[in-house]
Amino acid sequence: MKKKLLALLLACVMVLGLAACGGSKTEQPSSTGDSAATEEPAAPESTLHLGYDPNTGEEFYGPYYDEWSDMTDEELYEQALKEDTAINVYATSSKMLKAEEPFEEKYPGLDLIVSDLDTDEVLNKAQIENDTGNITADVLQTKDVNGSVFYEWYNQGILEPFYPRDICAHIDEGNLKYSYPLYASQAFWYYNTEAFPDGQPIDNWWQIIEKDENGNQKYRLFTKEIGQESSYMSLFASFINNADEMEKAYEDCYGEKLEYTYDPSSFNFEVPENNAGVEYLWRFSQAKMTFIGDGDELVLAVHNSTKEDPALCLASAGKIENQEESGYNIAWCVNLAPYTGLLNVESMFAVKGCNSPAGARLFIRYITGGADGQSGGLKPFTKVGNWPLRDDFEDKKNPKKLNELGAIANNLDDIYAIYPDVQDMWTYWLNQSPNK
C-alpha cells in the first residue's frame, strides 16, 4: 500500500507541476469565455498491457493477447533464425539447464544459453541491463509471491507479457492473471509418519501453536526464518487478509471465541484491531521454534522426532522426495483449516527490447509444453512437489492433484498492499519473543 500510494502521489505532483507551468502566463482570460482554457486536463492514458501503472493507478491483468500470441512454433522459428540466434535465459531453477540440449536439437541453428541465478539476481541483472541499454537477457524465469513483479517491474519497461493463445486455452484463467505460468508449487507442514501412524496430527493452523494442559508447546517447530522467506511472509499476510476465515477456523477447532491478545498500538502504521490473522502472526512469533535455512535439514529434524517429543516443520513440497530417496518418515499435512497454503506460480517472462524476441517466445512456448503439451520442455520440472497447470498434461509424479491439497490461489493485489507492514510486525514481535 505504501508503494502504491507513493507512486500515485508522485504522479499527482507531476500532473500538478505540468498544469502550473501551462498556466504561468500573466494575461487574464478572455471575457468571452474559452472553454478550452477551463477544461480539465485529460487523464493520462496507460500504455501498459500487464501490471500496475502508477501514473493512472490502474492494474492490468492477464491474459493479454497480441500478434505474438497467435504465431505458431514454425512461424516463430523461422523469424528467430533471422534475428540474434543466441537466446539468453535467466532462471531461478537449475533444472532449466536441462532444456539447453533438447531445445537446440529441436531447433537447429538456435543457441540456448541458460544462467542459473538466485531470484534477486534474475531481476536485478535484467534491471541493470535495461538501465544501461545493454540488454542480454531474452527470457526470465522466476516467481512473484508478494506482487512485487506485477506492481513494480512491468511499468519500468523491463518485462513484457507473452501469452500464447493456444496454450492458454488449456490453463485456468485464474492462473493467468498476473503472469504466464510454468508450474505451481507450495509449502507444507510435515509430520513424522512413525510417530503418527494413523495420519497427520493436525488439521488446523491453530493446532500448530497449540499448548498442552501444562501450558507447554505441543510440538517442536522447525522452519526457515519467516521474515526472510517472501513466500512464507505472503502466506501470513494472506491470513490477515482472510481474517474471517482464520477466526472461524479457531472457533470450529476449539468451540469458543478467539481471544485477541496483540497490541496494535506498537507501530507507526495502522494495524487492524481484532483481526484473527494478526493474532495468529503475534502468537506464532512468540512460539518456540528453530530456524533452519536448508529444507533437507528441516525434514530431517521431523524424521528424527518421536511421538513423545513430536515435531512439525514448514518446508517446500518437493522435500517430500526425502521420503523415498533417504528413507525419511515424513508426510505432508494437507487440507488444513482455513487452507493449507498458497499456490506459488513459477512464471516465464519476455524481456522488453531483447535481441531475440521471436526466439524468446519460441522458447517460452517450448518450455511450457508447446502446442500439444508434448514438446518435452516440461519434463525437467515434472517432479513431486511441482504441479503442471495445463489440463492436457498428465501429472504422473504427485500422489495428489493440486485441488485435493487445500491450497488457495495467491491474491497478489491484497498481499502487496500490506506486505511491508506484515514484515515489520513480524520482525518487531519476533525480537520481543522470550523464545528467540
Question: Model-derived features: where do they sit?
Answer:
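A ligand-binding cleft/hinge motif common to bilobed small-molecule-binding domains
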Residues: 147-152, 303, 310-331
